[in-house]
Amino acid sequence: MAARPGLLWLLGLALCVLGGGHLSHPPHVFPQRRLGVREPRDMQREIREVLGLPGRPRSRAPVGAAQQPASAPLFMLDLYRAMTDDSGGGTPQPHLDRADLIMSFVNIVERDRTLGYQEPHWKEFHFDLTQIPAGEAVTAAEFRIYKEPSTHPLNTTLHISMFEVVQEHSNRESDLFFLDLQTLRSGDEGWLVLDITAASDRWLLNHHKDLGLRLYVETEDGHSIDPGLAGLLGRQAPRSRQPFMVGFFRANQSPVRAPRTARPLKKKQLNQINQLPHSNKHLGILDDGHGSHGREVCRRHELYVSFRDLGWLDSVIAPQGYSAYYCAGECIYPLNSCMNSTNHATMQALVHLMKPDIIPKVCCVPTELSAISLLYYDRNNNVILRRERNMVVQACGCH
């Protein structure tokens, strides 16, 4: 469970230097120095990698996002709330437990064969899949379209069928693959959810191509109905009711990154350290309330990561920040139960007393880590919900 503790500490150190982290009662004095010209940018890039944010955060929100929320971000925000709801009282989402990454897609092209054409009538949607990360396994996929009450035809049962457009042809009908069928009444209103998971195998093989989905509406007697007349809304609908697609993915385990090599401080930098005043907003505070020798046992300390201070609120939708915590303190023999130590740590601490020049001290490290949920925009303004593992320290111990 104690995975990537070095990255978590690096995150805390970088945030405090950049002004985006707040510490309470740090137990040790750490060196401080002024950053070089490129170091803040390099640190922000490393923080993005730790959090799983792809590339540089967008410089601004999508056009019109401030005027009226769009349907996909609203739905993803509901998913985020369900994922972070500890009470279990939120709306049940059957696909959430198996997904580490959830992506929404807004249709980029919409075509209709409507009343001006021969039957059957249909509505076609296209989605850009190029932002799907390589190596992800699709656990589920849904197409969501809003239906308004329809009086044409009046009080009739409608069959809504969805197909994937496998191959288009100039001289004949496109090759289609059946995905789902839903039955409802013409007067029904609300979001219609169609299962398109069966199309996911071709996504992973051809995610450099657009995904085409075609929707048909028929009555009980097989008569084709224009989807618009049946109350199904498309791109011209209000932003909060526009159709979109959602993919649920099981992310691969993050590879273990090589630890950063600490660069030795130059003489000029050491002089700068000595000249810097201590501030309770940064690393370098010795808490006077931890014993006459300034020593405190290994425990968890507060470290808050603020996306507002990092200037990322135009990219990160939720949360505005989170408590990452960090582990610090002494692991001094005898190790008691509150130090959450292992038998090996107890033995190492004992041998260290006898041979301090040979055997190092036992380290205070995270022993239990938990995930955070992060909701953000990607480069194409698609909304992403990611469950990032091993980001919050739940417990510390001597190991």
UniProtKB/Swiss-Prot annotation:
The keyword Disulfide bond is assigned to this record: yes
Chain positions carrying an annotated carbohydrate: N155, N340
Localization per Swiss-Prot or TrEMBL: Secreted
Pfam families (UniProt xref): TGF_beta (PF00019), TGFb_propeptide (PF00688)
Propeptide, residue positions: 20-260
Keywords (A to Z) from UniProt: Chondrogenesis, Cytokine, Developmental protein, Differentiation, Disulfide bond, Glycoprotein, Growth factor, Osteogenesis, Secreted, Signal, Spermatogenesis
GO biological process: BMP signaling pathway; cartilage development; diet induced thermogenesis; embryonic morphogenesis; energy homeostasis; germ cell development; ossification; spermatogenesis
GO terms for MF: cytokine activity; growth factor activity
Cysteine pairings via disulfide bonds: C298-C364, C327-C396, C331-C398
Signal peptide positions (record): 1-19
GO cellular component: extracellular space
Main location: secreted
Primary role: Induces cartilage and bone formation. May be the osteoinductive factor responsible for the phenomenon of epithelial osteogenesis. Plays a role in calcium regulation and bone homeostasis. Involved in the generation of primordial germ cells; this function involves Bmp4 in a synergistic manner though separate receptor complexes seem to be involved. Required for the initiation and maintenance of spermatogenesis. Signaling protein involved in regulation of thermogenesis and energy balance.
Name of the molecule in the record: Bone morphogenetic protein 8B
Species of provenance: Mus musculus
